[in-house]
């Protein structure tokens, strides 16, 4: 009996010690609130630029999404991102009879939350048409309302009038085929596009890589998320598609300038895609080569980033996990290549 009583008393004491007592009736456990934990994405800067991460294709209940706009900001903060764009459909709003507000309302709600959490929020929208036009995001817009037009050409003209940054979305959707249509090619020739998604949702569009390189636009990787982000990608750092940006400053203007200058990398599912010069600088900042005993051909590589790398040394493949060091032996010179870093469809 004494042992049982002692156990009960110790348990009660532990409970009180672990809790913040509001009064004799209510104990609070704020430390169990997972909302206040941010999964930091530690990525190195490169010379002259600050490295930021973002998602530039996101939906809310104001179009066909499942969550309120401020929830998108909460998700981005928890996932370690720095910037998001709210890009609800202009033409497709199935919740329109239940949700009040004009086409700028989702941005206003998200931007207010962004100020509280330190997340940059970009005003945007998605021009939603069937092929051959396709889906197109207009970012950094002034007003979404006049973007809703009868003809897609009118919407593109309005985007130009508002000095928007324009992105071609999921170019292989919905028919699993990507080839520029005549109208898309004309818009590229007129310099109306600034970026192309090479990753969207759970898909990659490898043929887009060469077009991005040819046209000199930005590589983008975005979630196009509609449901809660954890429902699609799980919980943890580096799981969702994200665009890596090399910015002159940590501001909306800095993000815009980086996209317009095509200083971006696309990342998803352990794979990086981007311009060779940027990818080289970034990889060199992530990985450090150490000779352990060159006479015996023993070396090590340390990965100080939150991203994984796959190193091919001859015929051997080494996984370099985030924040880890690997050792390997190379007694004679061998060709070396990062298996998960691409500068084109078939170029590593």
Name these PLM-found stretches.
Residues 28-165, 169, 178, 198-199, ...:
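A metal-dependent hydrolase metal-coordination microenvironment
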Residues 12-13, 67, 98, 234:
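Alpha-helical transmembrane segments and their juxtamembrane interfaces
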Residues 2, 20-54, 73, 131-141, ...:
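Charged catalytic cores and adjacent phosphate/nucleic-acid-binding surfaces used
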Residues 2-9:
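Sec-dependent signal peptide recognition
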Residues 7, 60, 87-91, 223, ...:
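Ser/Thr-centric signal marking residues that sit
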Residues 9-18:
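Hydrophobic h-region of N-terminal signal peptides that target proteins for export
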Residues 16-17, 71, 96, 102, ...:
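Hydrophobic alpha-helical segments
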Residues 171-173:
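Conserved catalytic scaffold of divalent metal-dependent phosphoesterases
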């Amino acid at each position: 009996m004494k042992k049982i009583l002692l156990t009960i008393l110790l348990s009660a004491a532990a409970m009180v010690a672990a809790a913040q007592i509001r009064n004799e009736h209510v104990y609070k456990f704020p430390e169990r609130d997972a909302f206040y934990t941010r999964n930091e994405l530690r990525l190195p800067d490169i010379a002259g630029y600050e490295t930021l991460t973002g998602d530039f294709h996101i939906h809310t209940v104001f179009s066909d999404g499942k969550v309120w706009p401020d929830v998108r900001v909460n998700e981005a903060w928890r996932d370690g991102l720095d910037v998001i764009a709210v890009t609800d459909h202009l033409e497709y709003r199935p919740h329109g009879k239940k949700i009040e507000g004009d086409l700028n309302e989702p941005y206003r709600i998200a931007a207010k939350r962004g100020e509280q959490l330190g997340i940059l929020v970009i005003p945007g929208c998605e021009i939603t048409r069937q092929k051959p036009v396709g889906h197109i995001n207009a970012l950094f817009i002034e007003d979404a309302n006049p973007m809703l037009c009868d003809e897609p050409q009118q919407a593109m003209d309005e985007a130009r009038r508002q000095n928007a940054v324009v992105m071609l979305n999921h170019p292989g959707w919905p028919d699993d085929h990507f080839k520029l249509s005549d109208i898309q090619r004309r818009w590229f020739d007129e310099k109306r596009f600034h970026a192309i998604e090479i990753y969207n949702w759970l898909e990659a569009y490898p043929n887009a890589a060469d077009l991005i390189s040819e046209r000199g636009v930005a590589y983008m990787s975005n979630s196009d998320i509609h449901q809660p982000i954890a429902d699609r990608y799980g919980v943890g750092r580096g799981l969702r598609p994200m665009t890596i940006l090399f910015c002159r400053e940590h501001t909306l203007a800095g993000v815009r300038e980086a996209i317009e200058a095509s200083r971006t990398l696309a990342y998803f599912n352990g794979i990086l895609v981007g311009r060779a010069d940027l990818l080289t600088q970034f990889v060199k900042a992530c990985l450090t080569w150490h000779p352990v005993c060159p006479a015996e051909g023993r070396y090590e590589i340390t990965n100080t980033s939150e991203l994984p790398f796959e190193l091919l040394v001859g015929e051997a493949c080494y996984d370099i996990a985030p924040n880890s060091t690997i050792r390997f032996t190379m007694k004679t010179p061998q060709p070396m290549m990062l298996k998960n870093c691409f500068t084109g469809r078939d170029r590593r």
